[in-house]
Amino acid sequence: MKAFPKSDVPQKATKAVSLAPNVTSVIELDLNRYLTPPKSWIVPLIRPKNPVEHSAKIYDFNSLLSLQNTKLDFDDVEEDRVAAYFHTGGTTGMPKVAQHTYSGMIYNGWLGHELLFTEEDNVICPLPLFHVFACHVILMAMVSSGAHVVFPTPQGYRGDGVFDNFWKLIERWQITFVITVPTAISALMQRPVDADISSVKTSFSGSAPLPLELFRRFEEASGVTIVEGYGLTEATCLVSCNPVEGEKKVGSVGLKFPYTDIKIIKSEKGNLVECKTDEVGEICISNPGVYAGNTYTEADKNADLYYKKKYLRTGDLGRKDSDEYLWITGRAKDLIIRGGHNIDPAIVEEALLGHEAIAFAGAIGQPDQHSGELPCVYVELVGGATVTPEELDQFCKENVKEPGALPKHIEILEELPKTAVGKVFKPDLRMRAIKRVFSETLDSSGVNASITSVDDDKKLGLVANISSNEDDDTINQILGDFTIPWQRASN
């Protein structure tokens, strides 16, 4: 993108190219051509500078496009093949690139057309087009169904004025279907519904678990029912969804889509076996969006990624109930999901391990009422070393290159919990973080309640046990925006 007001994407791209000497060409797109006067007159006057720090040749996208033939001048290939590459979060500290086929993309668009949208629908999608849901589901479904889509800004929800004008945008474009994520719902609930949104029929939420209390607040404020779904970049996108028309189970991510199969597996005596109803295990999926055997561009990253050679092992933990509804209870992989965005804990851990006083570091996602999870890190010091959390916080600001990965809480422990082979045992750290965050939240509310423990429940996943004389509604008002469930502590 050519330098543009209120965007640092061009500057980041220039810096990236300067660090990649093998890049010889850059294709640049100028957003100003899509503006109308007087804005199109103003942009050239206030366009920020973007000094070129590389030797790559820069081409204008539209100039190149005008030189091309308007019809195919080669024989089109009829067989299926890779059509797109999308980066996805990983646990190794190195980016993974997922391969998406034409059939997988068409499948996602077909689902949107057949099950969600018609040519009468107006959809608002405040997700950026580098998000698989925006690109493969919404864009493809619009082409397939003839529905109309509104993308408020290139940055999605993060663009200026999106939240403050969201309800008015719905009224202006007579939106019937809202695409959202839990973080955005939380932000919208801090703003009054200041427009006529009676045109909205349904709202879809994905990317991260949706707290029950947030679900209820949105429904009460807007009169719109939220439909929760599940998908992932490695599967091109869609996996399951609560029925738009039919029984919706709040907290569940619904039923599998047509031509999708879901298995829940566990390891038993060294073998992978399928779980029984309501038994928690790893979620494995097979559908046209799964490029079995070739999910990632690097072959070694596809090793041990499949069950029975066709089911993608997602790394997510979940269960299927007696009605075949899918419930996600946790993650076998360690990714921190902040507002629907994946953060690799290795980014924080590797930075801190560069500090001379740090022997071990374990980064996790601690519960947050707005973002779902926020980065949190526990460290163990080298024998005899001394350092303060404040000093480590400053060290992170200087060495953690991804702003969203900066830890919101740093705690020094005498010794980190470890496995038998010496690896940091993160489930204990997650329980510790849940107890601390929930305790702080209860204390600040002034209610008579305390967290006695945090357990790993076979059906619910991690759950906080609370001792209190307060009624359930009072506790729900305080803790309901967290995705971690709570229950009364047994006597």
Predicted regions and their residues:
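AMP-binding/adenylate-forming catalytic core of the ANL superfamily
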Residues: 1-8, 171, 178, 287, ...
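Conserved AMP-binding/adenylation subdomain of ANL enzymes
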Residues: 106-125, 130-176, 191
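Conserved AMP-binding/adenylate-forming
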Residues: 152, 180, 202-203, 210-229, ...
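Conserved pre-ATP/AMP-binding loop-to-beta segment of ANL
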Residues: 28, 39, 47-87, 94, ...
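Conserved AMP-binding A3 loop
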Residues: 83-107
